[in-house]
Swiss-Prot record:
Its main location: membrane. This is ATP synthase subunit beta. SUPFAM superfamilies: C-terminal domain of alpha and beta subunits of F1 ATP synthase, N-terminal domain of alpha and beta subunits of F1 ATP synthase, P-loop containing nucleoside triphosphate hydrolases. It is a peripheral membrane protein. The lineage of its organism: Bacteria, Bacillati, Mycoplasmatota, Mycoplasmoidales, Mycoplasmoidaceae. One of its GO terms (cellular component) is plasma membrane. Produces ATP from ADP in the presence of a proton gradient across the membrane. The catalytic sites are hosted primarily by the beta subunits. InterPro entries: AAA+_ATPase, ATP-synt_VA_C, ATP_synth_F1_bsu, ATPase_alpha/beta_chains, ATPase_F1/V1/A1_a/bsu_N, ATPase_F1/V1/A1_a/bsu_N_sf, ATPase_F1/V1/A1_a/bsu_nucl-bd, ATPase_F1/V1_b/a_C. Its EC number is 7.1.2.2. It is an enzyme of class 7 (translocase). One of its GO terms (molecular function) is ATP hydrolysis activity. It comes from Ureaplasma urealyticum serovar 10 (strain ATCC 33699 / Western). Gene3D superfamilies: 2.40.10.170, Bovine Mitochondrial F1-atpase, Atp Synthase Beta Chain, Chain D, domain 3, P-loop containing nucleotide triphosphate hydrolases. It catalyses: ATP + H2O + 4 H(+)(in) = ADP + phosphate + 5 H(+)(out).
Length: 464
């Protein structure tokens, strides 16, 4: 029988705990340590070895009730997450303990820290993933096995858009999904769980939560816990996995809190000096290999609507598609409030999406760009001062802008309007008709919150 390697708590500073070990038993960085905190298991993760045989650790749960001199066990391995079929339909915390009042899984576990796949193992992602959301499919096509970021400030609809993508993709996708709730509202996680149960996708989904009320250690590691489950589905089962992370900014924020507690010098805007490294470690593991793919959708909170903030700016470089949500569009009551001019996708290329799709998308972007340039003239001088050509362009641009809106399935209970999914070919055809002037005699109001262009013609026929 192997000897249990024990240390003792030397100091407690909020979520940071110093543990002294005998020199021959000193744990490695990222090792999980365990102790009994008034009947419940508390996991610590080694972050620094500060000398004098002391391991400085981050707690994965509250440290209330800990005392100096308390015994701590070195598990000699990282935090281990349950993986495989046993996690489907279940809800876990950062350390792999169930939080759905069901028994703990007893099967295979994998460490949350591991290297990213090598270049030789990786596969390219160029297949289009249809979402049924017009503005996304037309202007910001998603790659199957790619990385997608939803950028937006507070209250512009990131979580609703993510839940809509879960509804549209996970339902039609047929594969397995993992949802990691990182530092967001517990209520939203609760709602998501019951919505998934109702729509019969829960048995193909694993959920991992480290929400707002958790200490920074849990919020910093829960994205890795969810990713570990997704990697197992990809590597061992050869699956095309969907990984949803809400919200990746909270991962950075937790890293910043931990960094300050560990006494590191802050860098730009008070973020941790290791920001790019930590983000890279996480993002490089979210990739497609020759065995299977991970398609990830990540919500990214943008502090004070500033896209140049180091946290969202660091995330940008890792993504295939960037969906930017705009407060100005949300204030017009147009949802999803996606900015067509700020959002970009690597896949919007005639060689990938085809010439017809590409040319319609470019024309939509051009007309909206010109419309934006004319806004100041319209505001000062009015529409009458525009040339006939520009006036026609503005009328079409307004129709295009309204037609980019769409009723969502997850907001059905608030809006009372049934959600709609639109096929890509119908989306392309609809915008082509508006741009070619086939809808010039229809008022722009009729284009709000409809699906296909045929729905607009039906609306007009009914109103006559």
């Amino acid at each position: 029988m192997t000897e249990v390697k024990k240390g003792k708590i030397n100091q407690i500073l909020g979520p940071v705990v110093d543990v002294r070990f005998p020199s021959e038993w000193l744990p490695e960085i990222n090792t999980a340590l365990e102790l009994n905190n008034h009947g419940s298991k508390l996991v610590l993760e080694v972050s620094q070895l500060v000398g004098d045989n002391i391991a400085r650790c981050i707690a994965m749960d509250t440290t209330d009730g800990l005392v100096r001199g308390q015994e701590v066990i070195n598990t000699e391995k990282p935090i281990m997450m349950p993986v495989g079929k046993q996690v489907l339909g279940r809800m876990f915390n950062v350390t792999g303990d169930p939080i759905d009042e069901q028994p703990a899984p007893t099967g295979k576990r994998m460490p949350i820290h591991r290297p990213a796949p090598s270049f030789a193992e990786q596969a390219e992602a160029i297949e289009i993933l249809e979402t049924g959301i017009k503005v996304v499919d037309l202007l910001v096509p998603f790659a199957k096995g790619g990385k997608i970021g939803l950028f937006g400030g507070a209250g512009v609809g990131k979580t609703v858009l993510m839940q809509e993508l879960i509804h549209n993709i996970a339902k039609n996708h047929g594969g397995l999904s993992v949802f990691a709730g990182v530092g967001e509202r517990t209520r939203e996680g609760n709602d998501l769980y019951y919505e998934m149960a109702e729509s019969d996708v829960l048995d193909k989904t694993a959920l991992v939560f480290g929400q707002m009320n958790e200490p920074p250690g849990a919020r910093m590691r829960v994205a890795l816990s969810g990713l570990t489950m997704a990697e197992e589905f990809r590597d061992a089962f050869g699956q095309d996995v969907l990984l949803f992370i809400d919200n990746i900014f909270r991962f950075t924020q937790a890293g910043s809190e931990v960094s300050a507690l560990l006494g590191r010098m802050p860098s730009a805007v008070g973020y941790q000096p290791t920001l790019a490294f930590e983000m890279g470690q996480l993002q490089e593991r979210i990739t497609s290999t020759k065995k299977g793919s991970i398609t990830s959708v990540q919500a990214v909170y943008v502090p004070a609507d500033d896209l140049t903030d180091p946290a969202p700016a660091t995330t940008f470089s890792h993504l295939d598609a960037k969906v930017v949500l705009d407060r100005a569009i949300a204030s017009l009551g147009l949802y999803p409030a996606i900015s067509p001019l700020q959002s970009t996708s690597r896949l919007l290329d005639p060689l990938v999406v085809g010439v017809k799709h590409y040319s319609v998308a470019r024309r939509v972007i051009e007309i909206l760009q010109r419309f934006m340039e004319l806004q100041d003239i319209i505001a000062i001088l009015g529409m009458d001062e525009l040339s006939e050509e520009d006036r026609q362009l503005v009328m079409r641009a307004r129709k295009v802008r309204n037609y980019l809106s769409q009723p969502s399935h997850v907001a059905e209970k608030f809006s009372g309007q049934p959600g709609l999914s639109v096929k890509l070919e119908d989306t392309i055809e609809g915008f082509r008709k508006i741009l070619d002037g086939e809808c010039d005699d229809i008022h722009e109001q009729h284009f709000l919150y409809v699906g296909k262009i045929d729905d607009v013609f039906e609306k007009v026929a009914k109103s006559k």
